[in-house]
């Protein structure tokens, strides 16, 4: 199965322009998912969250990309998770690793319950819009050890969404239930890049680096940068990433 057909699997085109909330960081994966949702015919509502991440330049990238792709509305919600810490992304005293960790080990860049928190915000917005679809860029192939990027997590969150909301409880059939879509979850990074390139995504604007500077320039050394570099190489696509000068 091609990356294009795998991403579109179980996702029927929407001729009615139904609203969908896309959890959107401004990174490579979520930008691809945003472009995909729009291509499918959804009316995209992009949700970005400033949670105190050290790579906050991704939010500036998200604002630019949302305008470039064209969304119905882009919301940036501020939620300070640095008060809790527990992650190299929210606690400056914890170094971002520059060498791969052990297989299946949950890395220090894991932010406690982050995707559950962010998806809950997306779910709340979707329900207020009268929409039933939430998209996010989870990926379990180029696995970094994040528990909230696994297929079983996505399925469990969707179940919870339909138990915890008015719209879910009042649904009279499966067509009226909330759906949580993770369309690139089974794709490699190379396949994601190939898909996005087909959709016209400008990856030069995306920020994936855990240590990106204020200009959005990547360190080229962290796990996220490493996976991105390998992805472009395997996809046979020129890497447009802007790197910091050493």
Swiss-Prot record:
Entry-linked InterPro entries: QueC, Rossmann-like_a/b/a_fold
UniProt key word Protein transport: no
Single GO BP term: queuosine biosynthetic process
Disulphide-bonded residues: none
Annotated cofactor note: Binds 1 zinc ion per subunit.
Database matches in Pfam families: QueC
Keywords noted in UniProt: ATP-binding, Ligase, Metal-binding, Nucleotide-binding, Queuosine biosynthesis, Zinc
GO MF term set: ATP binding; ligase activity, forming carbon-nitrogen bonds; zinc ion binding
Residues that hold Zn(2+) according to the record: 209, 219, 222, 225
Enzyme Commission code(s) on record: 6.3.4.20
Enzyme kind, highest EC tier: ligase
Binding annotation for ATP: 24-34
The protein's annotated pathway: Purine metabolism; 7-cyano-7-deazaguanine biosynthesis
Domain of life: Bacteria
Reaction(s) the record says it catalyses: 7-carboxy-7-deazaguanine + NH4(+) + ATP = 7-cyano-7-deazaguanine + ADP + phosphate + H2O + H(+)
Cofactor(s) the protein needs: Zn(2+)
Chain's role: Catalyzes the ATP-dependent conversion of 7-carboxy-7-deazaguanine (CDG) to 7-cyano-7-deazaguanine (preQ(0)).
Family: Belongs to the QueC family.
Identification of the protein by name: 7-cyano-7-deazaguanine synthase
